[in-house]
Amino acid sequence: YWLDKRMAKGTGSMIRALLFATIFMILFLASILILFGASDECSPLHAIWDSFATAINAEIPSSSDGSLLFVFINGIAAIIGLFFTSILIGIITTGIETKLQTLRNGNAEVLENDHTVILGWNDTTFAILAEIMESNLNRKMRTVVVLDDACEKAEMDDQVRTFIAEKDKERERIAKKKHEVFIPYAKHTQILCRYGTTAHYSNLENCNIQNCKSIIVNEDDDDETIKVILACSGIINDLRMSGVKGKKLPYITAVIHDKKNMNAARLAGGKDLEVICYPELMSRIMANSSRTAGLSHVFTTLFNYEGSDIYYVDKSEIKLSGKRVIASDGSRKHINDLTLYELNQYLTNATIIGGSRGKINNKVEQGRLNDNRWEEMESCLLPTMKSKLVKDVDHFYVLQMDDNPIEVTKNKCTISCKEVKEKNFSPHTRPDAIIGVSTLLIQVLKELETFLREDTLVYILEIQEKLDTYLADEDIQEEIQKITNVCLEWIPLDIDCYNSLYEFMSAPEHREIRSAIILSDNLFVDENLSKQEQKEVADSLTISRLLSLRKIQADLMPELFITCEMNYDENKNLAERTGAEDYIVGSNVAASVMTQISQVRELHRIFYEI
């Protein structure tokens, strides 16, 4: 029992026990030599040294070295030395193996500072990593820590290495084509994987979230997301209560997939949380992309780190104080007296798209959704550009290629900025069609309602059995009753059959349909399949329906806009090769927005307004 307790305490305790036992045996044998006078040199120190040297060397003395008792006692010491050496080697080997296993399991503590922590391992993880690595290309080495228990650390490491190698290969090919310098991701970003439950304090502290820059909660399930937010918020609150002066606290960025869980998430995270409502984000992009061809590409480019990016810049960083510029009439004008629109004409490497005053309000109001904190505030976007003066703004939202210092000239740019002319938008009266029902349907209809003319007809096409099941839900019926600005017509139709779709679209009253939105089939899935397989099946159905619509578009309706919701980038690329429709990959959009907000918290407001 004593030995069991000692072994449970680890390698150090076992080595100490072995050392004490060996010393005791050496002293015991030396005392026998002294007591019986078996050694020629009866000095106690000499006897102890003889026993110790014999034990260490494990060398049995010969008969010529002393008396028979001396040879016998030192022979026992040599045997004890053999046992000591063997057991010591075994203990050290076991300790090293245990430590290596700990490292393999990803339980080692992270010692980095100002890093990003991603909690959760799924398909979106790689999209987030790609965005972070892209954003780090013009920065010094940054660290990303990924924590989850979905698979072993070694497997996560292998997948990350493979992913980075594939991305670098693709980027190198594009760089050669454009004659640009290729920079591998690994030169600016290191990724550390850790194994553990994302909601456990010990695992979170192992990732050193106390000293990280931001935390991205990347769980598929809303309940799990709220648990992780609560755990992270607890650690951040402990840091706040510790009262360390000058300590910049991390914050949490998360996505909620069901709008009903927004309040719970916000209350769990408090002022340390920036939460994105996935249905609202995706439905807004889907609905607006259906208005004009190519708009989805604009959204995608705006949200990700490729090309020009949106930066949140303090006015002091632009060094406007006391600066004067030459106006169109030749007079000198103080730069603080310019409007934001006028200021843009003196910027050489950036474009201001908005501005704000004061600090962003992160206060939590119980019963209100996270994004509502901006409802009563003046817009920070372009509509205020001609009315808002530079002196009335503390921060700018700037669109530029890299986060280099913004250059202000005394004279206007040679390429003049054309004034944005607001056009009176006249809502069309032509009907729209939505192919398939999904978790986004109600929210998409609400977004369409905001810009379609009153009583515009919207057809919702779905297979009879699925449509009946969907409309039988009382909550769905309650939400449908709230949609009053457009007329909904539910059409039971075999949308997976080309002939059925063609027959419907070829009817004279249906040829006026202006746009078709294909929603991902994520409501009626095979529960026996994994989530990844379910998404693959949904994308396959989307591509099949797209091909049918594309043929109908070519034969009957050349002006038809088609917008598709996809789950995977690979499937989007496959569909893009044969058509020029608008594609929105939900996981990519969510990953891009989460990453941008995790890097600069204040960007959440402008993304909400966009």
Language-model regions, residue ranges each:
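Cytosolic regulatory regions of ion transport systems
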Residues: 1-610
